[in-house]
Amino acid sequence: MAIVQLREPRMNLNDSMATRSRDNGRGEANAQTVIDIKDLSLVFETNDGPVHALSNIDLAVKRGEFVSFIGPSGCGKTTLMRVVADLEQPTSGSVTVNGKTPEQARLDRSYGYVFQAAALFPWRTIEDNISLPLEIMGFSKTERRERIEKNLALVNLSGFDKKYPWQLSGGMQQRASIARALSFDPDMLLMDEPFGALDEIVRDHLNEQLLKLWAATRKTVIFVTHSIPEAVFLSTKIVVMSPRPGRIHEIIDCDLGPDRPLEIRESEAFLKIAHRVREGLRLGHIHE
């Protein structure tokens, strides 16, 4: 329950994706850095000795960007996101979220967190699952109802509010989880492989839905994935990470236009970026 109330972020969709990362249709305000990570390292102490999870991470995320973390298993993608979310503490370096410490940003509910599994309570209806963080935050019944209806509409689940999680497909459950994360209108969304367990057709559909949601809400998004096509399709910026210890190998701008039908994955521009990401992943392994 505490996790559900923790956080959520902002998203956008404008002219070219490169343009969007500088000016997401909101002028100079979008140039604001909302996540600022400087020289961050994290070492876990274990019975077998220290494990260097992250090393010398430097990253700035602008308001309205959609930033994907991609890399092999164990490279620290989720760990880095958890540091931003105040779920892990760095050993050294600094992190600010909206100019605050991660702890203060969490307490201010600056971001919503979407997990790999939908993490819906099976004994609560979809409506009641989405309502949970709002109840904790003290919203009135009328306000809760308005927000539930609004966010169910955003994720195309209107009419499913009285259903239980077990009555929904896996993809619908994840959409309900996203609606819950958006319910208190956070500045940002942190999404940890939310579609990783879904089949390819459902995943494609949810990728399209997420882009539309991003365009509608203009929230900053941090998205963890293992999928190169998914990262290129969704992102304005892709952070390629290498393992042992986790570090940033390369940051790649996605200079694609605002309209991204699934067919864009066959375009020369898309394939060129995908190839660059793949090469970055390969070289990151070689250099380790």
Features from the language model and the residues they span:
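The feature captures the beta-strand-to-loop junction immediately N-terminal to the Walker
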Residues: 70-72
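Helix-to-loop junction immediately C-terminal to a conserved catalytic motif
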Residues: 85
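Conserved ABC transporter NBD signature motif
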Residues: 93-103
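Short coil-to-helix segment of the ABC ATPase nucleotide-binding domain corresponding to the Q-loop/switch region
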Residues: 124-131
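Conserved ABC ATPase "signature" region
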Residues: 135, 142-160, 212
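Conserved signature/switch motifs of ABC ATPase nucleotide-binding domains
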Residues: 163-166, 184
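Catalytic Walker B motif of ABC-type/P-loop ATPase nucleotide-binding domains
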Residues: 189-192
